[in-house]
C-alpha cells in the first residue's frame, strides 16, 4: 500500500530537482552574459571559453551534489562521481560543455564583429549583448550589418536534431545532467535500502507520450526511472 507520506516525499524530491535546474540556469545566465561582455572588451576568446567552461562545470556539479543532501547512502558520493565523469552517448559532460562554450564564444564574436562593422559605440554593443546573448546569431544587428556593410559570416550547423543555438546547448547539457544525477541518486538510494521496484506517477497533465508510457505498471529495479527527459516532473514511488 502506497502511503500519503511516500507520495509527499517523492513529490518534494522532484520539486527540489526542478528547483536545482532552475537555479542553475540563473547562474549560468550570469556567467554567459559576463563572458560576452568580456569578449567585447577584448579579452581573449580562449581565456573566456576556458573560464566559462570551468564555471559552468562547477555550477552543474554543485547542484548535482545537492541530491546527496536529500538521499544519503553509503555509495552516494562514489555513484555520483562515476556518473558525472562518465561517458554518456559518446561524450562526458565536460566534453560537451567545453564544445558548447567554444561555440558560444564564436557566436558572440560574430555578433560583436557585426556591431563593429556598424561603428557601434561601446554602450551600444553592451546593449546588443544584453538583448541577444541567448541567441546571438539571430540578433537584428547581424542582418543590419549584412544589409548596410556587406558583412558576411559562416552560419554553423551541427546536424539534424541538434540545436544550433549555443546557449540552449549549454543550458540543456547542464540541466539535463543535474536532472539525471538527481534521478540516479534517488534510484540508487532506494536500491541500497532494499526496494524491489517502483511505480511512476505523472507530475504534470501536459501531454507526453514518453512519460505516459511508464505509468500504470510496476517497474523492477534496473528499469528506466524518472526523469525521462529534461523537463520531466514525473516521480517514482519505490516499494
Regions found by a protein language model. Name each.
Residues 154-239:
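Acidic, glycine-rich two-metal-ion catalytic cores of nucleic acid-processing enzymes
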Residues 1-162:
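N-terminal leader/targeting and assembly helices and adjacent pre-domain segments
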